Amino acid sequence: VIHLDELRYDASWNVVSEEEFFAAQRKVVAGARWVVDGNGSASLPIRAAAADTIIVLDPHPLVCLAGIILRGLRYGGGQHPGGVYVRVNCEFLHYVVSYRRKTLPKVLRVLDEHAGHATVLHLTSRRSANRLIRELDDAERGHQ
């Protein structure tokens, strides 16, 4: 699993150039098997064109805010074990609250344009996400 933040920031958490960010994603999606976690709307066409499956996580904004609070308590606002630095500010909170209204329609348009070949799963609850994880886990165990 590649977190987009790992590609977007250097080791000192400085933003890399857009060209470097896009090139890093092209390198990842050129691989045979990959999972990318993150939104990165401007570079979504790169990932969408190469993906066979796209999972759009779209829980209610209050669920997202609760998750942000819990992560903040768990990691103290710093870097969690996965290496992603927790950045919470007013701009980020506004983005989360307005995501469904402002960003999601753009994401869905990009997917319509660039991911017609892919299976797109639009999950709107933790329950549906957990169900998918169980189904994938069961399918993986069935192939072993």
Q: What residue spans do the PLM features occupy?
A:
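Short, charged, surface-exposed secondary-structure boundary motifs
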Residues: 11-15, 64-70, 131-133
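Short, hinge-like loop/turn segments at secondary-structure boundaries
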Residues: 17-22, 73-75, 139-140
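NTP-dependent small-molecule kinase module
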Residues: 98-144
